[in-house]
Amino acid sequence: MEYLIVALSSYLLGSIPFGFILTKIFLKKDIRDIGSGNIGATNALRTGNKTLGYATLLLDITKAVLPVLYVKFNYPDYIFIASLSAFLGHVFPIWLKFKGGKGVATYVGILFSINIFLGLVFIISWAVTFLISKYSSLSSLVGSLMVPMYLIVFENYNSIFFIIMFVLIFYTHRENVKRLKNKEETKTKIY
């Protein structure tokens, strides 16, 4: 029964669509009508309001940190259930007919909550890739791939969860992958 409560509460926290809420409140617009139509931080940056984009990023990270850290310290056996549920809440929010974001910021919150070093592996990989390419999507894919790769190569740690997360992030970026392949992907300005 506890795992159901963990899963549901983590999903509900993860499903709070901060990009949608913030653009509605501060810009009086629907973020789904802007840029890629995605509710996440990268598309929030495309609104032209960097503060709104960074606020979305921080809130999307936080909505994963809260349930995952709580579960980590109170129900550690369910940490991956909480993590996956928060991620799925962001990607498939009940409030927006299950059409959410791509889950990268939420995944960053998950990583830092599980192990700060894994969060750093992602951030460093993301930053290096972004500095070279200027593609947020490619950076997100590389960052999410580097976490299980790091665990496989350098740690004696079960990387199955992180491989699953990479596959899910790849899935949420499938259109970006097509655009990258066709050299049609839009570069991202983060500053």
Swiss-Prot record:
Q: Which of UniProt's keywords are assigned here?
A: Cell inner membrane, Cell membrane, Lipid biosynthesis, Lipid metabolism, Membrane, Phospholipid biosynthesis, Phospholipid metabolism, Transferase, Transmembrane, Transmembrane helix
Enzyme Commission number(s) from the entry: 2.3.1.275
Report the top EC class in one word.
transferase
Recorded catalytic activity of this chain's protein:
an acyl phosphate + sn-glycerol 3-phosphate = a 1-acyl-sn-glycero-3-phosphate + phosphate
What membrane topology term does the record carry? Answer: Multi-pass membrane protein
Q: Signal: present as a keyword of the record?
A: no
* Chief localisation class: membrane
User: TM segments?
Assistant: 3-23, 51-71, 78-98, 108-128, 150-170
**What InterPro entries does this protein map onto?**
G3P_acylTferase_PlsY
- Where does this protein act, in terms of pathway? Lipid metabolism; phospholipid metabolism
Q: Which Pfam families match?
A: G3P_acyltransf
Q: Which GO terms describe its cellular component?
A: plasma membrane
Q: Which GO terms describe its biological process?
A: phospholipid biosynthetic process
Organism field: Pelagibacter ubique (strain HTCC1062)
What is the purpose of this protein?
Catalyzes the transfer of an acyl group from acyl-phosphate (acyl-PO(4)) to glycerol-3-phosphate (G3P) to form lysophosphatidic acid (LPA). This enzyme utilizes acyl-phosphate as fatty acyl donor, but not acyl-CoA or acyl-ACP.
Give the family from UniProt.
Belongs to the PlsY family.
In which compartments does the protein localize? Cell inner membrane
Supply the name of the protein.
Glycerol-3-phosphate acyltransferase
